[in-house]
């Protein structure tokens, strides 16, 4: 039984490693290949790489700098430690891998963004609208430890309707640019891992979640 639990934990670490690997490769490529705000179409106008940076949580929520940024980074680190502790505890109880898989996705996503926050300010020069960032610049990075910006790039404006073409829609549907866009948020692979992990747990592991009550 212990061997089964160890196998589940090992596969959870494999999931975390693969998510982190893809997330960081994509972020480093974007950071060293694109200027801030640059857009690269991938699938027509439905899927684009659009490079932005933010201080906040998934999808750019709760953005901010200074103390808020530091507090958010520390909170992420504490949350990751807690998630790893949960993974180890559950694996020792021979919890089914489906549960471990969902938690591993969430853990990997949280780790992907904390890597940006902790290290990117030290190892990259600043990205601007006219200049591509350099990895390990001679003059040092653009910010201190725990103050790096999170790199976002995945953009899916599947529906893009101008206000004049949808006058029947209420005004609050339209952004400052006068367009109703779905899906407007720009995010990264780590954000996607967190979101998929949460929905996976709610949809496919709800019976296990009920046992926590």
Give the ranges of each region predicted by the language model.
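Alpha-helical transmembrane bundles and membrane-interface segments of multipass inner-membrane proteins
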Residues: 1-213
């Amino acid at each position: 039984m212990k061997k089964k639990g160890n196998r589940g934990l090992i596969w959870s670490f494999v999931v975390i490693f693969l998510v982190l690997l893809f997330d960081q490769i994509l972020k480093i490529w974007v950071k060293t290949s694109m200027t801030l705000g640059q857009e690269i179409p991938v699938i027509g106008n439905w899927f684009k790489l659009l490079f932005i940076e933010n201080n906040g949580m998934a999808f750019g929520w709760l953005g901010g700098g200074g103390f808020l940024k530091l507090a958010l980074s520390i909170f992420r680190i504490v949350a990751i430690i807690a998630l790893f502790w949960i993974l180890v505890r559950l694996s020792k109880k021979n919890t089914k891998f489906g549960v471990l898989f969902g938690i591993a996705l969430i853990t990997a996503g949280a780790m992907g963004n904390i890597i940006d926050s902790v290290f990117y300010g030290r190892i990259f020069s600043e990205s601007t609208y006219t200049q591509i960032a350099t990895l390990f610049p001679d003059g040092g990075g653009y910010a201190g430890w725990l103050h790096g910006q999170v790199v976002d790039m995945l953009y899916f404006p599947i529906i893009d309707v101008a206000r004049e073409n949808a006058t029947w829609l209420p005004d609050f549907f339209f952004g400052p640019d006068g367009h109703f866009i779905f899906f407007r948020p720009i995010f990264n692979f780590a954000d996607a891992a967190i979101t998929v992990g949460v929905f996976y747990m709610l949809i496919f592991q709800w019976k296990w979640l009920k046992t926590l009550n």
